[in-house]
Amino acid sequence: ATRSRERAPAQASWRQGAEKAIHYVVGLERWLTSEWLLRTEAYYKDFRDLIVQQIEQGGNYFTERVPGGDIRSVSGWTRPVRNIGDSLTQIPINNSFGEAYGVEFLLEKKNSERGSNFSGWISYAYAHANRYQRRDIIPFAFDQRHTVNIVGNYSLGSNWELGFRWQYGSGFPYTEPIGLKPRILLLDTDNDGKPETPVVATRASYANPNSNEVIFDIDYGDRNRFNARKPAYHRLDIRVTKATILWNYDWTFYLDIINIYNRTNVVGYSFYVEDDLTLGRETNSMFPILPTIGFSVKF
């Protein structure tokens, strides 16, 4: 079965107020030694008057497969019928609220004592970020449960330095489609200027231009937003630098290697309709291993 929405005429004003947020933060900090610092922080953010699409009384159109029918043909689907329900409009209104809360820990090593060659820090954060809309709990796009950062810098002597950074983040939410559905259009069949007759949309067949086939759209579901998570993100970057003086100027030569173990980190997914009417998915990833050589000069 599939549904299509008919939008009711917009009656509301396009004016809306500003979104509001109140932040509550508490933190503790303690020097364990002259070089080691421990810091922890907890927070809560209360979001109000978040802007969402206005819901108005409209109509959903519903069609089902005909048993044994050809799904590429209009005859393979029942005639679309109206199912009274709510519809999302493009009118923005302040009609949602949300919250974000979490805790962060930081252990930092300062390079403050004579003979100390290493500095860096380790951090960990645990967080939740949700909005509440239409009795649904929906994560924000930036909702990330766990993040870890490990950063270090070591002096090798003779103006050589080695630095590294490892990052980890659990997956961000995204909306996974639930399948495909025929596209339903409203046509003006009585020439009164009002499209009101629902039909299953078709186009010329690629295989046979003399016949038409049903147009399919990706079905994300009516209340299915951010129902899945991307894979975790992590990578290791290193940097080697050498400082020297040439021609009475300060020179720094460096080698950067980003994503040294060539991790495939997913940015997102692109969904499309395959020729065999299955749901296709293409992974969009960040850059692979990327070495860079360069220098800088201070005049």
Residue spans of the language-model regions?
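Outer-membrane beta-barrel signature, preferentially recognizing the C-terminal barrel domain
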Residues: 1-39, 43-47, 69-73, 82-102, ...
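Residue-level detector of the transmembrane beta-barrel scaffold of outer-membrane proteins
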Residues: 1, 37-39, 117-121, 151, ...
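Gram-negative outer-membrane beta-barrel transporters
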Residues: 44-46, 58, 62-173
